[in-house]
């Protein structure tokens, strides 16, 4: 029951919430090797353009994933 794009690639990783940045990067790159992963503090204002090669990781003050990582 994962959310996938038209090429059957995973586009969301809800299972990574509360995991470490390192663990999240490893899992995402296994699923989507071309991903450009960007780590940002939760609450950071970001641009709204959609990029199929980008995954933003919003982290809490302990560098754990605070929001579901998504392609975009």
UniProtKB/Swiss-Prot annotation:
The keyword Acetylation does not apply. GO terms for biological process: response to wounding. The keyword Metal-binding does not apply. Coiled coil: none annotated. GO terms for molecular function: serine-type endopeptidase inhibitor activity. It comes from the Eukaryota. InterPro entries: Prot_inh_pot1, Prot_inh_pot1_sf. Keywords: Protease inhibitor, Serine protease inhibitor. The record marks 48-49 as: Reactive bond. SUPFAM superfamilies: CI-2 family of serine protease inhibitors. Pfam families: potato_inhibit. Belongs to the protease inhibitor I13 (potato type I serine protease inhibitor) family. Inhibits both subtilisin and chymotrypsin. This is Subtilisin-chymotrypsin inhibitor-2B. It comes from Hordeum vulgare (Barley). The lineage of its organism: Eukaryota, Viridiplantae, Streptophyta, Embryophyta, Tracheophyta.
